[in-house]
């Protein structure tokens, strides 16, 4: 098992107590897989980099993800979450990247322009007191949080025994605590599926996984490996409609739902259990982003960014799950390396016209989703060049085509193939397509995923 040795890199209280401000080129907020990848890429580009992390260790959520499945793309081998994280921790330790651990960021404020760029001040608090870090660029890599019971408004009493799936995962894998002995899982997201298997391995009886939608929301491999292989039932178009219990959960009421996702009267049944785990969605942690003036995309609840992952606030970049929820840590790493390299280019004034959208380039296109596309990212294109587009569909479809539209004109059409909401899709948008849109005089291009009726 990988270990987390922070002896040489931790920002000790005694070393920063007398320092009010420290200057860097790039300040990365978040020490998980996104933050570490961004920091390493920025450092490789020659920037002076700092990572601010609220926990006492680097690694983020991967520290509690002890299951395999990481690294297949990035390292070409299968690793557990801690093993995957440790590889980046070791790389960070081998550099002079400054670490501020156990430090909570209070805010990000833009300063006066200096040498044609904005200087940002990141104010943080740790056991030594308040400290300010300045940077020409800031990378937001705070990750995401789980949606709670109160956010989905499950009726019933409020007994002990209701957990988010991620919290239960931490209890079992980090704290060595057993959250219950008989559980129901609401939601078939990947964390819920993984916890169904983990609970079973720990001797906790899983009464079933209940999913509101008529399809599983997790990756197909997780449905097979975590449910099918362990004989755990998956109940689609079914939800929890009441929590029963006084001091502790005693049972939950589940009901089938109709095509409008409303409970169907007469389908209620009681499932005895002492624990309810919720895997009902992830929300990017963007309170800091909003306070810094960053515009959020209503579809992703992450920042609106351009092709370099720069937000609408010059010098502030975003990557990983704080930008949009990913399926795989490997994809987070790849995206975050792009953000870190772009942040360094911005901070150092290197290659701004190529990598980071600059004023005067004459390119300003917004990208909007249509059809069954749930979102399109980036939301803005500010340079003419090969651009990677990410999107996710809102419902599964056996046959659909991706189309890029500018007004009434179709600029690009992909092959007909199936799409699933559980899989984040991406494809390269050629520079000639972007230039064509500009030649048409439009200010918006549309990424549309349109179902195709098979003959």
Protein language model annotation of sequence segments:
Residues 8-10, 14-16, 144-184, 188-193, ...:
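Glycine-rich dinucleotide-binding loop and its adjacent helix/turn
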Residues 14, 140, 162-172, 275-326:
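FAD-site-proximal beta/loop scaffold in flavoenzymes
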Residues 319-367:
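A conserved FAD-binding loop/helix module that cradles the flavin
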Residues 352-397:
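Surface beta-strand/loop "capping" patches
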Residues 24-87, 91, 179-223:
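Beta1-alpha1 glycine-rich phosphate/pyrophosphate-binding loop at the start
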